[in-house]
């Protein structure tokens, strides 16, 4: 694969910034249209997502990341979702990283209208491919991620079924933009604090996608601490707008989930040193 030159990469910065603003405006417009719709059922939940990310650096340009996300409803009381994911990352350019991997997800029934029509827990097996673009404007870090997912969701034949009889294949595209800015100067090996925000839009596609072509949108505001280069922790608010893939009484169902998220990152350097 031909490498991007630094000059050519930087020449796309203005266009990249326009794309960021266009997508943000699109997401805001989507949210406004969603709020204005009348043929809908609204539900709301308090959520807490508690996540751990471990990165094993294999070389200067490659790494493996394993993550577990403990997603709860009622802040911490009830299961919402369990997500285990592992991926391989390769750096194509100092500012461009490619990722691919696998995820195992368990989604649980919660709230008055569960995601599964029979009110059952279901399994999802997921493959993903992603491109991450990093940029900086002075001290502001800008990260954009485009992700493609192939999702196999467990399906029950009836309410009496005790296990999933089949798995339906669904496609999904995700776009995330994240902004991060330090709020303290790095000390001598002491690390620094920062603030960050991100927004991520999910769009479903494929013959098995029903009502939720607009799948969900996530918005977060965070404060974090970066210790040197190996450890990072951040926490803040999380808003999830999610559309169910089915109608209830002829109406679309939207979840308005608000809560907290806590993310812990740690990197292990496995590169061989002379």
Give a label for each model feature.
Residues 46-48, 80-82, 123-127, 167-175, ...:
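Residues that define the transmembrane beta-barrel architecture of outer-membrane proteins
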Residues 52, 85-86, 129-131, 175-177, ...:
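Membrane-embedded beta-strands of outer-membrane beta-barrel proteins
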Residues 56, 90, 102, 133-135, ...:
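Residue-level signature of outer-membrane beta-barrel architecture
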Residues 60-61, 95, 136-143, 183-193, ...:
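Short loop/turn motifs that connect adjacent beta-strands in outer-membrane beta-barrel proteins
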Residues 64-66, 98-100, 140-146, 173, ...:
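Transmembrane beta-strands of outer-membrane beta-barrel proteins
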Residues 68-74, 102-108, 135-137, 148-152, ...:
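Transmembrane beta-strands of outer-membrane beta-barrel pores
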Residues 131, 256-274:
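Outer-membrane beta-barrel "beta-signal"
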Residues 147-244:
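Outer-membrane beta-barrel transmembrane domain signature
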